[in-house]
UniProtKB/Swiss-Prot annotation:
CDD domains, alphabetized: TFP_snake_toxin
Location(s), subcellular: Secreted
Role summary: Binds to muscle nicotinic acetylcholine receptor (nAChR) and inhibit acetylcholine from binding to the receptor, thereby impairing neuromuscular transmission.
Extent of the signal sequence: 1-21
Protein known as: Three-finger toxin MALT0052C
Family (UniProt): Belongs to the three-finger toxin family. Short-chain subfamily. Type I alpha-neurotoxin sub-subfamily.
GO cellular component: extracellular region
S-S pairs: 24-45, 38-62, 64-75, 76-81
Keyword Secreted (UniProt): yes
A molecular function GO annotation: toxin activity
Species annotation: Micrurus altirostris (Uruguayan coral snake)
Lineage: Eukaryota, Metazoa, Chordata, Craniata, Vertebrata
């Protein structure tokens, strides 16, 4: 009986995902700001801003990457921090 209980505990621990998945605002263009759950292992959100003829564009999502000059990139590491 103890062996069965121990086996159930081990299986439960292995099957559960103890990692926290990050939630970022997602805004790609003119659709509007929503949220997305980032893939496992992704630890940053971004907000990217640049100017166009029609005004300032803002894009948001999961991740953080290098951008070209003239683009402002802000990266952060907490849920909904890129709003």
């Amino acid at each position: 009986m103890k062996t069965l209980l121990l086996t159930l505990v081990v299986v439960t621990i292995v099957c559960l995902d103890f990692g926290h998945t990050l939630i970022c605002y997602n805004d790609h263009g003119y659709i509007g700001k929503t949220t997305e759950t980032c893939e496992n292992g992704m630890t940053t959100c971004y907000e990217e801003r640049w100017r166009e003829a029609r005004g300032t564009r803002i894009e948001r999502g999961c991740g953080c990457y290098k951008v070209k000059p003239g683009v402002q990139m802000n990266c952060c590491k907490t849920d909904r921090c890129n709003g």
